[in-house]
């Protein structure tokens, strides 16, 4: 279990220490579950009333909240960002063994950097290049001529097809498939003719991809995931999609082929986005959004009807179904009124 003196933690976080710097911190916890040795954080003033009951040894908070502190405190401008950084310092995620498992199958032409770890039953095909400190989990497959940059990690059972490029310090969770064929077919009098997908997938640096996500290779041009992109679980990214730097994609999102998304966008969970169009920089699509047309102006966009009691929803649905008829009737009434005037 990691541990650190509160004073040392404050220094690493560039935080202002209030209280005993010799307190030993052994973990991060929520305000409700924290015990002695834990550090917690408060991001909303409405939780001030809970400080009296909180058992944490220290709390991260803003200057405005400091008068309400009942324990040692670290004062910062952004408690949530500080929480992320101290969680990294006190991370308890298991570290892989620094070795290559005897059951791993590695082609003799593969190039391995320094301190590479490869788990049991992993397969590394010919021409693969793994940078320094790369971690390949048990059961992974890395296809011919693919490249994985230094410091990147594949958790167990990740599949990387041939000719894929993954940048430095990336993280890919279990069950994800990168580089499978895109959904490309031509129709010959009712019969589907497969179009070989000869593009690649290019993934930038510091990209994180959740579990069981699929990113298809390009048909001709490449599918591209920019630097700093984060993608949640169970997303489908079709062939030739381009996602700009530092965009965030929540779980269950489906992106159709040849879509281009700008930088610093946020795509809410279960959204569906049409292909062959562009979304500009700094766009937020709220959850379950259905994006059928290009978005050319930054901002927040929503679609759909939020949850309602069933009886209310049925009335709403009936109104929506009849809105065209209602519009025609309204225009007819307007014409009659205008004629009377």
Curated annotation (Swiss-Prot):
GO molecular function (one): N-acyltransferase activity
Annotated GO biological process: lipid A biosynthetic process
UniProt-listed Gene3D superfamilies: 1.20.5.170, Hexapeptide repeat proteins (2.160.10.10), MurE/MurF, N-terminal domain (3.40.1390.10)
Pfam families, sorted: Hexapep, LpxD
Keywords tagged on the record: Acyltransferase, Lipid A biosynthesis, Lipid biosynthesis, Lipid metabolism, Repeat, Transferase
Annotated catalysed reactions: a UDP-3-O-[(3R)-3-hydroxyacyl]-alpha-D-glucosamine + a (3R)-hydroxyacyl-[ACP] = a UDP-2-N,3-O-bis[(3R)-3-hydroxyacyl]-alpha-D-glucosamine + holo-[ACP] + H(+); UDP-3-O-[(3R)-3-hydroxytetradecanoyl]-alpha-D-glucosamine + (3R)-hydroxytetradecanoyl-[ACP] = UDP-2-N,3-O-bis[(3R)-3-hydroxytetradecanoyl]-alpha-D-glucosamine + holo-[ACP] + H(+)
Active site: 239 (proton acceptor)
Record pathway: Glycolipid biosynthesis; lipid IV(A) biosynthesis; lipid IV(A) from (3R)-3-hydroxytetradecanoyl-[acyl-carrier-protein] and UDP-N-acetyl-alpha-D-glucosamine: step 3/6
GO cellular component, one term: membrane
Keyword Repeat among UniProt keywords: yes
Known EC number: 2.3.1.191
Oligomer status and interactors: Homotrimer.
Function according to Swiss-Prot or TrEMBL: Catalyzes the N-acylation of UDP-3-O-(hydroxytetradecanoyl)glucosamine using 3-hydroxytetradecanoyl-ACP as the acyl donor. Is involved in the biosynthesis of lipid A, a phosphorylated glycolipid that anchors the lipopolysaccharide to the outer membrane of the cell.
Family: Belongs to the transferase hexapeptide repeat family. LpxD subfamily.
Protein name as annotated: UDP-3-O-(3-hydroxymyristoyl)glucosamine N-acyltransferase
């Amino acid at each position: 279990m990691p541990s650190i003196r509160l004073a040392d933690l404050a220094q690493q976080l560039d935080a202002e220490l209030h209280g005993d710097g010799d307190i030993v911190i052994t973990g991060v916890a929520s305000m409700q579950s924290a015990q002695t040795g834990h550090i917690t954080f408060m991001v909303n003033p409405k939780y001030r009333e809970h400080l009296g009951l909180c058992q944490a040894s220290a709390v991260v908070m803003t200057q405005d909240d400091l008068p309400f502190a009942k324990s040692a405190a670290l004062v910062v401008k952004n408690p949530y960002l500080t929480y992320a950084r101290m969680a990294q310092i006190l991370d308890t995620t298991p570290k892989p063994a620094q070795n290559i498992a005897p059951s791993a199958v590695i082609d003799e032409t593969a190039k391995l950097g320094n301190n590479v770890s490869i788990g049991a039953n992993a397969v590394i095909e010919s021409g693969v290049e793994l940078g320094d400190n790369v971690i390949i989990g048990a059961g992974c497959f890395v296809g011919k001529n693919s490249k994985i940059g230094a410091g990147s990690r594949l958790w167990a059972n990740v599949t990387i097809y041939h000719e894929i490029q993954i940048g430095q310090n990336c993280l890919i969770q279990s069950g994800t498939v990168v580089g499978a064929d895109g959904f490309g077919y031509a129709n010959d009098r009712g019969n589907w003719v497969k179009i070989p997908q000869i593009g690649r997938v290019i993934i930038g640096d510091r990209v994180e991809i959740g579990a069981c996500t699929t990113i298809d290779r390009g048909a001709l041009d490449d599918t591209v995931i920019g630097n700093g992109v984060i993608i949640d679980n169970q997303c489908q990214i079709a062939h030739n999609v381009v996602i700009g730097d530092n965009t965030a994609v929540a779980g269950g999102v489906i992106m159709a082929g040849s879509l281009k998304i700008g930088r610093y966008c946020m795509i809410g969970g279960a959204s569906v986005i049409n292909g062959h169009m562009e979304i500009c920089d700094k766009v937020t699509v709220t959850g379950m959004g259905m994006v059928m047309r290009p978005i050319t102006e930054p901002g927040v966009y929503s679609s759909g009807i939020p949850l309602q009691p069933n009886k209310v929803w049925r009335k709403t649905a009936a109104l929506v179904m009849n809105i065209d008829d209602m519009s025609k009737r309204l225009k007819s009434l307007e014409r009659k009124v205008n004629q009377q005037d």
